């Protein structure tokens, strides 16, 4: 891609200017300083200004003011090419909430029939749990039973983990059996919000918050960030963060061939960049294994929700340097704290024939307890 966006310029003046697609305050915050460029995975791959946060905000401004027509192909391409990792937010001196702008952009670009068919299918299925059951995607044992009190913290069963990785929730409950698992849980709406339907994403988050009492604990970093945005950070905790705050002391050690296992971490982008949670998973891993900080652990793995399905070649281009770093680190395990990352890493490691295994944080800690017995 070599298409250049309109050159960065001052924001449009005056109230009521533009189409009303974006939060004008957020658009106006961007001062086009370029601090975001090195943090952006797609800009690092292409060196293309249009594929940077600064360039994309310039495109958003051009769409808002009518400088670019709504059907301009660069708008469609760049709104899709962005991973939505929000790494740019952590280095932005102006405090631009880029993730919010991206959701608004995709609300426009992916409205109605313009939404990719696979996104339409997935969002329809996860918003209707009975469809998951009908299609056999949720196994009978996928919903574990917790032993917590009705008004205690609730373990939220993520849509993806419920169907593909039920062992993660079971491991979480072995570690914290006091967690309550209310029946009838629905989708939190993160998938919708990130894929052009932020209104449904908000409604589903609020509905889930009303259905589940107390603190919501989730084993998915992306769900945690989405729920915290709509329900408030005091009501939502990612599982590792919950363990850390509750003073959980991991038991046992993870061993491989009689030695302490070497374990690295793949950060969840939204957990790290959206909620600022970085220490808890590292400290928990270090308590049961030899923790190895892999270069680029905080960089996106290329999963990015539906991105790996919509743009597999671009997703692999983001993942491949990470796979090389994992191989160089000679790990026994790499830990993920988000189901999309877990899937991405497992597929990549399998493709390259690596000996490293990708596991969820809850699974690693449960494995340590098993080794103790």
Predicted segments, located by residue:
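Conserved aromatic-histidine-acidic binding/catalytic patches
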Residues: 28, 89, 93, 160, ...
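Residue-level recognition of short, well-ordered coil/turn positions
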Residues: 35, 67-68, 87, 113, ...
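Iron-sulfur cluster-binding electron-transfer modules in prokaryotic oxidoreductases
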Residues: 3-8, 18-20, 98-373
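Short amphipathic alpha-helical interaction patches enriched in hydrophobic/aromatic residues
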Residues: 44, 64, 89-92, 231, ...
């Amino acid at each position: 891609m070599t298409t250049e966006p309109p050159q960065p310029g001052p924001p449009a003046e005056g109230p009521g200017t533009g189409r009303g697609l974006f939060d004008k305050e957020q658009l106006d915050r961007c001062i086009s300083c370029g601090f975001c460029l090195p943090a952006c995975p797609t800009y690092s791959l292409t060196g293309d200004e249009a594929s940077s946060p600064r360039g994309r905000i310039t495109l958003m401004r051009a769409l808002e003011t009518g400088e670019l027509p709504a059907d301009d192909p660069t708008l469609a391409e760049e709104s899709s090419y962005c991973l939505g990792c929000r790494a740019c937010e952590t280095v932005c001196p102006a405090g631009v909430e880029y993730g919010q702008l991206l959701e608004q952009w995709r609300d426009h670009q992916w409205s109605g029939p313009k939404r990719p068919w696979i996104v339409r299918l997935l969002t329809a299925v996860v918003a209707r749990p009975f469809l998951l059951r009908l299609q056999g995607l949720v196994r009978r044992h996928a919903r574990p039973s917790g032993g917590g009190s009705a008004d205690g913290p609730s373990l939220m069963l993520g849509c993806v983990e419920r169907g593909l990785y039920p062992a993660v929730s079971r491991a979480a409950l072995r570690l914290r059996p006091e967690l309550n698992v209310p029946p009838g849980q629905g989708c939190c709406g993160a998938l919708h919000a990130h894929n052009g339907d932020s209104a449904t994403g908000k409604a589903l988050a609020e509905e889930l918050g009303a259905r589940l009492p107390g603190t919501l604990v989730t084993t998915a970093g992306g769900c945690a960030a989405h729920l915290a945005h709509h329900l408030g950070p005091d009501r939502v905790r990612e599982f590792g963060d919950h363990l850390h705050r509750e003073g959980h002391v991991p038991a046992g050690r993870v061993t491989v061939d009689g030695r302490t296992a070497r374990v690295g971490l793949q950060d969840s982008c939204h957990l790290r960049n959206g909620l600022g949670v970085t220490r808890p998973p590292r400290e928990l891993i270090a308590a049961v294994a030899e923790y190895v900080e892999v270069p680029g652990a905080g960089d996106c793995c290329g999963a990015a929700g539906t991105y790996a399905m919509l743009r597999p070649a671009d997703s692999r281009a983001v993942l491949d340097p990470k796979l090389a770093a994992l191989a160089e680190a000679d790990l026994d395990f790499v830990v993920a704290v988000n189901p999309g990352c877990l899937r991405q890493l497992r597929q990549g490691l399998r493709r390259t024939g690596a000996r490293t295994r990708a596991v969820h944080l809850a699974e690693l800690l449960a494995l340590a307890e098993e080794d103790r017995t």
